[in-house]
Amino acid sequence: MLVELLEFTPLSFIDDVINITNQLLYKGVNGVDKAFSQTRFAKKAPQEIEEGLHKFEVLFESVVDRYYDGFEVYTLRNIFSYPPELKGYMRTFGKDVDYSITTEQDAAMDQAIQEAAEKLVVKMQLRRDLRMRLSRKREKKTEIEKHLERISFLNKVPENWQVTLPETTDFLLDQLGNLQHAVKRVVEASPTVHSREVDERITYLEKGYERLSNPIDQQKDFWSHHLSKLESTANTETANNIHKLLLSSEKDVGHTDEP
């Protein structure tokens, strides 16, 4: 009965206690041996020290055995035992418990278990979704922090240049609409051209400008204006007009170079 209740035998418990005590005893003997070996008498009388330690160990073992024999007897008689007169009065566990259940109660219990399982599945799915959202939010937060770190220098611009940020922002917002309408009108008014054709035209005009800028310095601003206009509008009509002007200018330069 005791073994079934305690899940170990009483003798094994007593043996464990005695073994722990013997281990402490041997540690104490080793400590005494180490202390004597560090004294000045260790080299003069090593044999006497060894004999004294042996007698000390035997004495301790005999004392432990004598007292723990009494401990074993007392434990088995008074702790791990019960009086014989109590045998007829021990109540069996669960003897008066009613485990009967009706069909309605069984069905209600099954229904409750099913509902709890469905709720658990929903909660677990919600938990997975929330974890995924949290992971994405953390990634976005990290990315935003990197971008903020890159543009952190903008916070010092108003202080260094004494710019009134609210008024400047309002002005930029007002001009943004006008700029969008202007770009839209330019795109609608300009015919679509290939970028390669425009690049070739620009290269040709730049070479013509280099040839004409040296002998005719007063035309420098004129051709610079037309080149910047061509690069900004990319209009074939403007390119053709400038091309005609260059041809006429080349003819004029040819006439002036003749003697």
From Swiss-Prot:
Transmembrane regions: none
This protein's record includes keyword Lipoprotein: no
Pfam families on file: Mis12
GO CC terms: chromosome, centromeric core domain; condensed chromosome, centromeric region; inner kinetochore; kinetochore; MIS12/MIND type complex; nucleus; outer kinetochore
Coiled-coil ranges per UniProt: 123-156
The keyword Disulfide bond is assigned to this record: no
GO biological process, one term: kinetochore assembly
Record's subcellular location: Chromosome, Centromere; Chromosome, Centromere, Kinetochore
Residues modified to Phosphoserine: S190, S213
Modified residues (Phosphothreonine): T192
Keyword vocabulary terms for this entry: Cell cycle, Cell division, Centromere, Chromosome, Coiled coil, Kinetochore, Meiosis, Mitosis, Phosphoprotein
Taxonomy, superkingdom: Eukaryota
Family in the record: Belongs to the mis12 family.
Quaternary structure (record): Component of the NMS super complex which consists of mis12, mis13, mis14, ndc80, nnf1, nuf2, sos7, spc7, spc24 and spc25. Interacts with dis1, mal2, mis14, ppe1 and ekc1.
Annotated function: Acts as a component of the NMS (Ndc80-MIND-Spc7) super complex which has a role in kinetochore function during late meiotic prophase and throughout the mitotic cell cycle. Required for correct segregation of chromosomes and for maintaining the inner centromere structure.
Protein's name according to its UniProt entry: Centromere protein mis12
Native species: Schizosaccharomyces pombe (strain 972 / ATCC 24843)
